[in-house]
Swiss-Prot record:
Protein location: Cytoplasm
Lineage: Bacteria, Pseudomonadati, Pseudomonadota, Betaproteobacteria, Burkholderiales
Segments forming domain S1-like: 1-72
GO CC term (a single one): cytosol
The protein's name in its UniProt record: Translation initiation factor IF-1 2
Length: 72
């Protein structure tokens, strides 16, 4: 998949789910399932409910996202 195809959006983590998965509410009101990207997992970045995150969505499945950045 090319990097041009991704859609980046801001969101807020609502809850933790098993296997490093999170329920994220996007700024447009949609709720998606998000998983942590590999770089965040390697650097042990912790994500808690209430954190603001940047997610990447693909045009193929808009119900799932990849969490790529956690803002402070």
């Amino acid at each position: 998949m090319a990097k041009d195809d991704v859609i980046q959006m801001q969101g807020e983590v609502l809850e933790n789910l098993p296997n490093a998965t999170f329920r994220v509410k996007l700024e447009n009101g949609h709720i998606v399932l998000g998983h942590i990207s590999g770089k965040m997992r390697m650097n042990y970045i912790r994500i808690l409910p209430g954190d603001k995150v940047t997610v990447e969505l693909t045009p193929y499945d808009l119900s799932r996202a990849r969490i790529v950045f956690r803002t402070k």
